Amino acid sequence: MSIKYVATSKLPTPWGVFAMHGFEDTETSKEHVALTFGTLSSDAPVLGRIHSECLTGDALFSLRCDCGFQLQTAMQNIAETGSGFILYLRQEGRGIGLLNKIRAYELQDKGANTVEANEQLGFPADMRKYDMIQPMLEQIGVKHVRLMTNNPRKVKAMKEIGIEVVERVPLQVGKNRYNEAYLKTKSTELGHMMSEYHFTDEE
């Protein structure tokens, strides 16, 4: 994998003005983005998140997942902290792509869970890779992280490239009647670390 830094621009948001850094994978032509806020330290832990693209949740306000809620909460937390980063990776549908994700949703509408749907389409439960994060973090100057995630694979990916994960910060937001079963499957079958709050009926 060959990641090339392209350019940086300002990104005004409801939570403040972030910097948006563009990257291109010259082997796959996929484009990734790093958002940064404030002054990042290479010596002190920086609050951050690795976020995989989710068009339905991030842009179309879908309640089938917690992705959009997690992205907005991460940006808000970073702004309130005064500094931080988000690596926005173009890995739609845990790596299977948008159209296959819609096919998976169709199977879920018929009773399959999120893992079963991927497998019925011939895909692993999670196809995402994280080798692109090393050059992205080098570009923005981050070496120590307070990582906002429920996914142990992301913590492992950070450690494997030599980034110290000082703290895992849980990001449990967005539970609703449309995604409760999905969240439970992420915990029981994909190993995501979530509290019982996500598996009890809303009052």
UniProtKB/Swiss-Prot annotation:
Binding site for Zn(2+): C54, C65, C67
Single Gene Ontology BP annotation: riboflavin biosynthetic process
UniProt GO MF annotations: GTP binding; GTP cyclohydrolase II activity; zinc ion binding
Record carries keyword Cytoplasm: no
Record: active site: D126, R128
SUPFAM superfamilies associated with the record: RibA-like (SSF142695)
Free-text comment on the cofactor: Binds 1 zinc ion per subunit.
UniProt-listed InterPro entries: GTP_cyclohydro_II, RibA, RibA-like_sf
Highest taxon, organism lineage: Bacteria
GO cellular component: cytosol
EC class: hydrolase
Keyword RNA-binding appears in the UniProt entry: no
Cofactor: Zn(2+)
Listed EC numbers: 3.5.4.25
Catalysed reaction equations from the record: GTP + 4 H2O = 2,5-diamino-6-hydroxy-4-(5-phosphoribosylamino)-pyrimidine + formate + 2 phosphate + 3 H(+)
Keywords: GTP-binding, Hydrolase, Metal-binding, Nucleotide-binding, Riboflavin biosynthesis, Zinc
Binding-site residues for GTP, renumbered to this chain: R49, I50, H51, S52, E53, Q70, E92, G93, R94, T114, T149, K154
Family: Belongs to the GTP cyclohydrolase II family.
Function comment: Catalyzes the conversion of GTP to 2,5-diamino-6-ribosylamino-4(3H)-pyrimidinone 5'-phosphate (DARP), formate and pyrophosphate.
Protein name: GTP cyclohydrolase-2
Organism: Shewanella sp. (strain ANA-3)
